[in-house]
Amino acid sequence: MLTAKEIRESFKQFFASKEHQIVPSAPMVVKGDPTLMFTNAGMNQFKDIILGNVPRKYPRVADSQKCLRVSGKHNDLEEVGHDTYHHTMFEMLGNWSFGDYFKKEAINWAWEYLVEVLKLNPERLYATVFEGSPAEGLDRDNEAAGYWEQYLPKDHILNGNKHDNFWEMGDTGPCGPCSEIHIDLRSDEERAAVSGADMVNKDHPQVIEIWNLVFMQFNRKADGSLEPLPAKVIDTGMGFERLCMALQGKTSNYDTDVFQPIIKVIAGMAGTTYGTDKQQDIAMRVIADHIRTIAFAITDGQLPSNAKAGYVIRRILRRAVRYGYTFLDRKEAFMYKLLPVLIETMGDAYPELIAQKTLIEKVIKEEEESFLRTLETGIRLLDKKMEETKAAGKTVLNGVDAFTLYDTYGFPLDLTELILRENGMEADIEEFNKAMQKQKERARNAAAIETGDWITLKDGECKFVGYDLFECEAEILRYRQIKQKNKVLYQIVLDQTPFYAEMGGQVGDTGWLIADDEKIDVIDTKRENNLPVHLVTKLPKDVTATFTAKINVKKRIQCECNHSATHLLHEALREVLGTHVEQKGSYVSPDSLRFDFSHFQKVTDEEIRKVEILVGEKIRANFPLEEHRNMPIAEAKALGAMALFGEKYGDEVRVVKYGSSVELCGGTHIPATGMIGSLRVIGESSIAAGVRRIEAVTAEGAEQFVYAQQDLIRELRALMNHMPNLAQAMKKSIEENAEMKKQIEDYIREKSMRLKEEIVAKASESNGIKVMQFVGKANADAMKNVAFQIKAETTDSFVFVAGIIDDNKCTLMLMLSDDLVKEGLHAGKIVKEAAKHIQGGGGGQPHFATAGGKNMEGLSIAVGAVKEAVGVQ
């Protein structure tokens, strides 16, 4: 039996013998092509040659190309792991001719390699050819069919439609008819019972396409028209993993030596055996596939991120983590540990894996740990929303809730949809998109500020007295009107102020300007051109009056607690993690603090606990504030003061000291550390390579955090009837819920079966079409099952239409047979139009569609409208 390495090498040797130049794989991540993020086919690196933009270097080439298909037309992500042959990253064995040979040689050599070199059984092979497209003036590919007739009987040469046999890289670009080679790997008994010709392109896991020969002769323009390419091109692609499956006598790509070494390591980590549990097997296949994609993307320079190609890689990584978390009990980072076995299986062919091993492991580990935190929060929130949705008798999650999970908690929409599908639900994507659009509009509006001219009342500069005073007398020096977010506001500069203007990460003070019987709200204080600017919602009646400028003392003290805590936190982090820790940024508000610092790995729970303990000791020591204003910077540095990231310092600085913590700082601070009360870390994450972020609360915020945890535990205990072992009680409850869910699903399945039998028994025929319908009360989910059962079991031309009343709601449903769809009928369009009769809307796919509405009296009319659109009675 040939190994994967031997198969890859044999392909290259064969085409080298046919005078092809063997070229290395292009990077999987595409640079410089606005139409592509990833290499999704072997021809991508030759696109400019095919279009005639650059001269060919060789007339014939062959290679093994790393490819990634997860977005756009070639979106295979949801199938990966659930079947035996779909992948995100895969290798494409390919040979090309640029204006040299064409169909005859391509077909001859494909046959020679498969049958004479690899010894595949020709009786198991089928070829498809393009049937033509009258709409585009394209005839059947009789030339290719004629060449295939030299090797295959006519019943092994099949016509294929435009979807299967006219290859296009995308909405625009090179394209042309193609000829697919399929192999039937079923047993002799199965082949005798059902011809392989009937299984081609029917998604049978053992009757699969292994090679696609594309006869590229057109370029698809942006307007959809076709133009001839400068020279005819042969572009072939053979799925390496599928070929290995066929040659190694396996029933799944994942059973070959391409994946099995990785799967065995995953199974060992999970303490299970591959092949013993369906859902665990799916999870292991997902992880084995995705680790390859992620590793190769990183070697090609694409790190996970929240934008474009980086987001795709992050999605794939998070999907794998989610499967490991849910089905293999992988609650800690584990995927980075798969790098050694991946290198063992693919390092020889792709040495870049070996060179980048340390980077790949580090990036994957950090991403895993970050997402595990997000996952726990997101799943918990989504579970709650699903329960609320089901309790309301609905199966569609509010799109705003899905957007909140995405926007606020970083929970990917595709994972939300996956979890919903597993629970028989879906998300309102239209509503989600609307929420996304509104957010973009808000961001645009927030960025636009219109400012008027300054009106000067007095000359002078503003003096800050807020280190010593919470309020003072003040007069307005100047003011101006601004317009922000369609609101009219005013900026005021005072001659002296206790208001701290936002700087150094500390937010600005809020408070009031008070004069006689008037109290003006100061909603923020910013620094513009080194001026403390007070933002107010309205101008005082008398702008020349003398005011009492008074800050919100409670919020100021909360800010001071958090700011002083960042100094103690900084010192504690250096003590626990090492002196390489340096502040890279901070954010201090009354509610919480954020502290960014240099560190090259996740701060562990144990390290966080040590940091909290150290900060707690410094708080309880009640160190007094030692403040040195206007100290020469050289003297401050001699004292051990640390200069902080992003700050500019003059010749004289302010030094803030608590015990052994000494920093240069212009912010406001508490008189003694004891006022902080306590500090609790509520989050730790990576914000950039080598930069970590800690989020924490202090004082009252820390108390509220602890109370919330206690309340949660009490609530859970109450829900679990105060069982002594909460975790065990919850586990039991989950198991019971799972059993109940299964019983409900069994009931719906059984009910669907009975309902289907009743509907089929009452079927009629109209214009040669079998007509099945239902109007009345029923469970919408059960009826959907009925629709798909009918499609699976009905070979004749048919239409199934249902008008369903379920829990005071009405649903219109339509399922069409394949032949009706090929004739041009589209269930989604028909249902969308008919839904007007029930005052609703909806749509769907060409085969199946649904619409919801509120006018139950119009159901029968809607059903009639559907039948009329189909052309039946």
UniProtKB/Swiss-Prot annotation:
Q: Name one GO molecular function term.
A: aminoacyl-tRNA deacylase activity
What domain of life does the native source organism fall in?
Answer: Bacteria
Q: Which PROSITE patterns match?
A: AA_TRNA_LIGASE_II_ALA
Q: Give the Enzyme Commission number.
A: 6.1.1.7
Q: Which InterPro entries match?
A: aa-tRNA-synth_II/BPL/LPL, Ala-tRNA-lgiase_IIc, Ala-tRNA-ligase_IIc_anticod-bd, Ala-tRNA-synth_IIc_core, Ala-tRNA-synth_IIc_N, Ala-tRNA_ligase, Ala_tRNA_ligase_euk/bac, DHHA1_dom
| Protein role | Catalyzes the attachment of alanine to tRNA(Ala) in a two-step reaction: alanine is first activated by ATP to form Ala-AMP and then transferred to the acceptor end of tRNA(Ala). Also edits incorrectly charged Ser-tRNA(Ala) and Gly-tRNA(Ala) via its editing domain.
From the Swiss-Prot or TrEMBL record, give the protein name.
Alanine--tRNA ligase
